[in-house]
Amino acid sequence: MDAVRFVESCEEGFVAATVTPRHLLLNRNVLFQGRLQPHNHCLPVLKREIHRQAIVSAVTSGSKRFFLGTDGAPHERRRKECPCGCAGIYNAPVALALYAKVFEEVGALDKLEAFTSLNGPDFYGLPRNTSKIKLIKTSWKVPESFSFSFGDIIPMFAGETLVASILLITRKSVFTNRL
């Protein structure tokens, strides 16, 4: 709440905030569901539900001061599930579907494009990306993990069913990701 108020109180064009999917969807309760949940540990630490709601309200309001910032953290399982585990949540495979979920839930899908694709480059004075994506409303299951030569990475919402897949349309090709 305080961070949202601070960003909103500053002169437009000088201060903005990137917002992660985890801070839009999770509160501190998910850290301790039954026992410590290391794959939900991140920095800044998740706050109370009232804070999450304030962030959702700010992000879906259409304000140009807030934009996508996945802050993906692909730490290997063994570096998360240990006494001094790394902070961060790996959300790259699910980020766009999760942002779409939040915007749809509050009836603000018309503001999703600006949040994900326009506000950031405009704030930094960068050119806007000319590639296009299309979200397709379909159910898919998030993989339990992704295996790499260096170890397994557990994604945000591993094993859960999400609604939305991504069709990426570039100038040269079409790429479908059902994740």
Feature-to-residue mapping (PLM):
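Short, glycine-/Ser/Thr-/acidic-enriched flexible segments
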Residues: 22, 73-75, 140
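Short, solvent-exposed polar/charged micro-motifs at secondary-structure junctions
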Residues: 4-7, 27, 123-125, 142-145
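C-terminal cap of metal-dependent C-N hydrolases
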Residues: 130-178
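His/Asp/Glu-enriched, well-ordered alpha-helical/loop segment
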Residues: 61-128
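Proline-rich low-complexity regions
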Residues: 41-46, 74, 143, 155
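Histidine/acidic residue-rich metal-binding segments in metalloenzymes
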Residues: 1-68
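Metal-cofactor-binding active-site regions of metalloenzymes
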Residues: 1, 127, 132
